[in-house]
Amino acid sequence: MVKIRIRSPLWYDGVDNAPHRSYLKAIGFTEEDFSKPIVGVLASWSELGPCNYHTLELAKYVKEGIKEAGGVGLAAPTIVVNDGINMGTPGMRYSLISRDLIADTIEAQFNAHGVDAWVGIGGCDKTQPGIMMAMVRLDIPAVYLYGGTAEAGWLGERELTIEDTFEAVGAYLAGRITLEDLKRIEELSFPSYGTCQGLFTANTMAMIGEALGLSLLGSASPPATSSRRRAFAIASGRAVLKAAELGITPRKVVTYDALYNAAVTLFATAGSTNAILHLLAIAHEAGVKFTLDDFDEISKKVPVIAALRPAGPYAMQDLDKIGGVPRILKKLYKAGLLRGEALTVEGETIGKLLDRWQPPPLPEAGVLYDVDRPYKPYSGIRILRGNLAPNGAVMKVGAAERLKFEGRAKVYDSEAEAFKAVASGEIKAGDVVVIRYEGPKGAPGMPEMLKITAAIVGAGLGEVVALITDGRFSGATRGIMVGHVSPEAAVGGPIALVQNGDRIVIDGEAGLLKLELGEEELERRRKNWSPPPPKYKGGLLAKYASLVQQADKGAVTSPPVL
């Protein structure tokens, strides 16, 4: 057994630390408590939306598990930026920034106070990768716990998610539904606290937590309102001390094989493209070489086996009813697509856990398919390259009916300009909407584009109009959408050189994103291009723009691990 009071003695043992003990005795510590491991409980709590509304309650259950296992739990908060509420507003510039801030705040709090281990509770999109980045950065025993998905809504026999509300706005603007129809969907689409209900970014990252081995097997799918969510909170508290006893730290878990498994799972479920950014960032923090080239190679081997929204009709709660994420992982493992020797925080390899796990005796009911008879015969996401994205771009082919598209560019230097064009009917079938200067440095913050992509789909243009951007997409995005174009426009990437009327080729099968111009013309335009002035001269956004790397590097702000 490994000594599990690995850091706290420096803070709390000995005569010279008597004042430190006084501080904790003031909040109820006993003398005996100082002989136990001190375990941080990170609650990403906020009332600024439903996603993290309940995490303080979950923290209490985590502390119960820690106490049962012989430790003392101390809760601490971090910030939350609710992506859905900020969509299409200046607030979205703070979304991706918050991921790195969350990792930084966790490092500051838990390193400053010498905790021996910790459990991180995440909910909304960026809290989860931020916590996972901090786990490998601190590299002390840690377990990730997801706050859980919201329940789906219902409109008669129609299952609703927040995706329906975003798309209903586009349908209303196009005259396809009435204002009363829109209001009914608005009222019914999000009936409980928890995260967005499809396999959007939050549920994707929760699934990734299981695939990486950072969270307990089966813990991703129970809804936020489920009693099993509280049971997993208690179990996570126990598990972190077991991991500490076994000497298991996150960098022993987040290896190349674990990242490989996460990528396979992402592609097999057509999960959020944001997960590629986040996995690149997690690998960066772990000091593991895992690049877009790895994603590209893996994507060529994996079909889509899950019919989860937005690629299919089902919500996360439907997956939960038939066994949750382990049912997906076991299919992939039995097909030889997962690397079973990857270690997990539970102290066993993922292969051993999956060998032991048995699905409930329920039919898959169209939610899941077999690898040899997939839902779609190709990967959910493809990496694109070409003269428009020399360093790469991503396309969620699993949520598009067409993998190939050619059209003429309509260029906008902000999402707001492009949204006005959609709302006014300026965008027509055959157009390729190009939205630029929305990348990591240019926006800054690489905002998501759900407001405009949902408007395009809602207007009935989802399969006849394409969109290309150096920004990001929500996990709820569907249609012919290409994002993360790198290099971005603000640093002189080729997307900055596109002009109205230029012909663009998108080929999701071949992995191609091409501007049909000769190199001489591109060079002429490049000589005439000059970078725009920074949008912010002070504050957090200016600091971020000065530090952030490009999307193909995970849009990270911290130096590499040596």
Curated annotation (Swiss-Prot):
Name of the protein described by the UniProt record: Dihydroxy-acid dehydratase
Cofactor: [2Fe-2S] cluster; Mg(2+)
Modified residues (N6-carboxylysine): 126
Catalytic activities: (2R)-2,3-dihydroxy-3-methylbutanoate = 3-methyl-2-oxobutanoate + H2O; (2R,3R)-2,3-dihydroxy-3-methylpentanoate = (S)-3-methyl-2-oxopentanoate + H2O
Coiled-coil positions: none
UniProt record similarity statement: Belongs to the IlvD/Edd family.
Binding residue positions for Mg(2+): 83, 125-126, 448
Assembly notes: Homodimer.
Function: Functions in the biosynthesis of branched-chain amino acids. Catalyzes the dehydration of (2R,3R)-2,3-dihydroxy-3-methylpentanoate (2,3-dihydroxy-3-methylvalerate) into 2-oxo-3-methylpentanoate (2-oxo-3-methylvalerate) and of (2R)-2,3-dihydroxy-3-methylbutanoate (2,3-dihydroxyisovalerate) into 2-oxo-3-methylbutanoate (2-oxoisovalerate), the penultimate precursor to L-isoleucine and L-valine, respectively.
InterPro entries: DHAD_IlvD/Edd (IPR050165), Dihydro-acid_dehy_C (IPR042096), DihydroxyA_deHydtase (IPR004404), DiOHA_6PGluconate_deHydtase_CS (IPR020558), ILV_EDD_C (IPR056740), ILV_EDD_N (IPR000581), IlvD/EDD_N (IPR037237)
